[in-house]
Amino acid sequence: EHLTKKYGEKTAVEDLSLHILKGEIYGFIGHNGAGKTTTLKSIVGILQFEEGEIRIDGDSIQENPLACKKKIAYIPDNPDLYKFMTGDKYLHFIADIFGVDEHTRQERIRKYADLFEITSDLAHPIASYSHGMKQKLAIIAAWIHNPELIIMDEPFVGLDPKASHILKGMMREVCDEGGAIFFSTHVLEVAEKLCDKVAIIKNGKLIRSGTMGEVKGDDCLEEVFLELEGE
C-alpha cells in the first residue's frame, strides 16, 4: 500500500499500491529502470522504503520480517548462489533455513531436479554451472519450503524453451494449491498467456493494473504497453 522508495533525491517508486491474492499469477511489466526490481526488493525486505506499508498475509514486512520471510521465496534477476557448494548441498542448506524435514526436502529436490533434468549435476560445484543451470537451481531452492508467495525478477531469462515451459507449469501448480506468484518480465507474450493479472509501471509509478481483460481490452498486451509507454 502506497509504497514510496527513494535513492537520495531520486524517487525510484512513488505511491505504488498492489494487492496480490491467493491463486493468482500476477505479472509486473515495465522497461528497464521503471522500478520493477526496487519494488520486488522492497516487498521481500531487502530494501528499506520511505513511505507505505507492505503486508504478507496480514504480517508487516517492517514489523515482523521473519514471519513474512517464512511465507515467501524470492528469485532475483541474477541469483547469487554459494559457488563453492555443490547444488545438492545448497538445496539442503536452504531447506535447513526453512526447517523442511528430511523426507519432504528429498521428495521436492528429486521431483524438481528430475523435471529440469539436472539431477546428476547436483553433485557438482555451482561454480561449474551455466547461467541456465543456476537459474534452475534457484527455482528449486525457492520451491523447497512450499512458500505461500513466490516473487521472481525476470525468471525466464536464461531458461531454454523446455525449462520455461516447466516453470510455467510449476507457477500454475502453486496457484492451484492456493499460493500466489508475483513476477517481473519484459517478455509480453509470456505475461499475456500466463498471467491472471498484470500491472504496468513507468518511471516508478503504476500506470495500469487489473485482470488481463481490464488492462488490454480487445488489444494485445504489446500494443497497450507501447501505447502507455509513449504517453
Regions found by a protein language model. Give the residues of each.
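Conserved ABC ATPase "signature" region
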Residues: H92, D96, H103-D121
